[in-house]
């Protein structure tokens, strides 16, 4: 057998949220991947249906129309924008460009699993900082950093805990990290947050040359199937990442549909309103049943159980009823489960089954 890179052997394969079995004839109730339950508006659907693309032609490699739209809406210079096949690809590109066997990639203990995978894939040294009350601990992150720390990944809000860092905490983190460390703020769930002391950090990033802010169309925009993420970066970082970014990495349909969705302000507003209502509803229902729910600002909740066994038994029992939620063993949270804010029908079905198992 041909041996792989040693760092690759350290990587635990990423396991996505379960989607059900192809053997089952009934449609699964999938609450495991934080997908949007909100349907596109008729106007957006009509625009999409009128989109006719020549499949024999490669897509625009620079996503120029979409880049222009994002530049206008978010008030950022188009030279600072880069696109990825999902945010994941951007995390890999950053790791490949800025890490090696002598340099560290830093992240919070219960941060998104792709961070350590990307760091290891780039032969970097993985370092994580302990959290406090399921929230990234700024002092611990700063303490764990040193002059070999080149990248710090931080999800804000965090997946899978749903907790967030305030504007002042992000600034404290940036000021406490080494000057040569790139702070990468993953704001995949930022649009769901309504807390006044929160920011997606774009405004702050524009004042500095050492911050990257990533965003995605997979969550509130409901485009998970088309894989599209983007990042605001210092111009030099964009130029560096483009050296190894795969050509034509964003398909033509993803580019066109994203442009249409960015114009649909009502869709975005409806998604936020829906999420706030049903997240509160689900949290209250689980609290009423005696479960501890960690306060979340995202489109999911994390439920903490008395033991890992209790959490696993509930998830396994729900699977038998074709309901899928997220076990968090790989996140070092084996006594917790993550549940997406799905459709009203799916959430009520989930609650009925949980009550039966009480």
Positions of PLM-derived features:
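N-terminal "arm"/small-domain region of PLP-dependent enzymes with the aminotransferase-like
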Residues: 1-57
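Phosphate-binding glycine-rich loop
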Residues: 65-104
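Short acidic capping loops at alpha-helix termini that bridge into adjacent secondary structure
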Residues: 77-81, 101-104, 148, 180, ...
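PLP-dependent aminotransferase-like
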Residues: 97-154
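PLP-dependent enzyme catalytic core of the Aspartate aminotransferase-like
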Residues: 168, 175, 309, 317-321, ...
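Conserved PLP-binding catalytic core of the aspartate aminotransferase-like
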Residues: 276, 288-321, 337, 341
